[in-house]
Structure formats: C-alpha cells, structure tokens
C-alpha cells in the first residue's frame, strides 16, 4: 500500500493490523521494523472491517492524520491452530472453508475526494449455539444479518441503495443462511450480495469446499478487486461487512460454542 501511494513508512501516524495467530504475532512481526505506533486488532475474520471502522474514526477525529489498516491470514497456521495439523490428514467436511493465505492493507487519510469510509456499524456478539469449527459460515451468518439490519434501520436505507453488499467469508453455506435470515424480516439482498469467500477462489477448478475464509480473505479481495472496481467506475457506493468467528484454540478444542461478530463499513466515492 505504501509503495502504491509512494509514501515512506515514517509518513504513517499509526498501524492497525491483525491476523489469526495467537497474540497477532504475524502482524506485529510485520510492523515492528516500521518504527510506527502500532495497535493490534483481533476480530477474527472481521478484522479488516474493524480496522477500517476504527481507523476512520481516528482520522475523522484528528487523532491520526494518516494511518494504515491491515489484516492477514495463513492457511497452514490456521489449520494447525484451530483444527488439525496438515500431517494428520483429516478429511474436511463439505461445509468446511479454506483459510486464505493472503493480506490486504488500506491507507486512510482525510481528503476532499476519493473513496471514503462514509459510515460504520460495529457489530454485537451473537451466539446461536453452533460449535462445529468446520461450519463457520453457519456460525457467522446470524451476526451478519443482525449488523446489516441494524445498519439499514439506522440509516433508513435499503439494499437497492447500494451497488454491492460484500460479506467477508460466509462462504456458500453462510451466504445461503444469511439470505434466509434476512428474508424472514423482508430484506432481500440476492441481487446486490457477493461474498469474498466465494470470489477469491476459482471454485470450478479448485476444491475449496464451501469457499474461502480468514482475515486475509476479506482484506485481499477488498484491496484488489473491490478497489479496482471503484477506480474503474463499476461501483460508487458499497457495504463491506466482514464477519468473524470468535473462537480460540482452547475453546475449539473443548467443543465450546462459536460466538460470531460482523462489522460493517459503507465505502463510497465522495
């Protein structure tokens, strides 16, 4: 991101970054040599939207002039930490998703024109009793539905007001669940919706089961495909909602429920 913006690291007032590893070790190892103030973020796969929402507030308030929001994930590390080491050779269920090895970062600064963080909704933690670490789409869909409904109610808008409604990594199972939950309340997003977990892989040629997941899934799709769509004039007003399954290696190993959360930011051209 800094290279694209032709900016040195010292131009940043703050780095907001997170990943899926214990103590966000990947993010702080990547940030430590920048010699820039750092705030670690953990929202599971919702981290990119969380960073954009928090970063937008910090820039708008004047607490930071320019900052970087980033998120990353790694397939093998996530499998070892939350499920089984690859050497174990466990069979993945059809509802399982493939953690993306990827990263994305955005630079936020107060400007008079360009792509802006217009609004944000911070999600609430939702627990509907799902405990299967191989079916996180089902665990996260209720949080996505709640956050989106809160946002639409607060802003008095409808799905038709937006060019796209992007979720982070609900995958195939979670996206269908989201449609069902919203349509019970009279909200239809099928025309506007897409999911980063369904976009990032070529699923006709790659066996990733229910799709992609991980902090890097939403971050890398947003910072590549979606930003390109903005630059090319294909979209001007979107909702980016990243969802996170709030589990730890301990809770996962004990078979505890998987609470979830979803944070939403409205990105638009101003």
What do the PLM-derived regions correspond to, one by one?
Residues 17-18, 67-73, 108, 238-243:
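Short beta-strand segments
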Residues 24-25, 75-80, 125-129, 174, ...:
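Short, well-ordered, mixed-charge alpha-helical segments that flank or form enzyme active sites
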Residues 1-6, 54, 139-154, 221-226:
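Short, well-ordered amphipathic alpha-helical segments that serve as non-catalytic structural scaffolds
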Residues 85-150, 154-157, 187-208, 234, ...:
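Condensing-enzyme catalytic core mediating Claisen C-C bond formation in acyl metabolism
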Residues 143, 149-181:
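Long, repeat-rich segments with strong aromatic
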Residues 1-46, 161-176:
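Conserved beta-ketoacyl condensing-enzyme motif
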Residues 42-69, 108, 213-234:
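Active-site-proximal alpha-helical scaffold in enzymes
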Residues 28-31, 170-185, 250-257:
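Short glycine/threonine-rich loop-to-helix capping motif typified by GTGT followed
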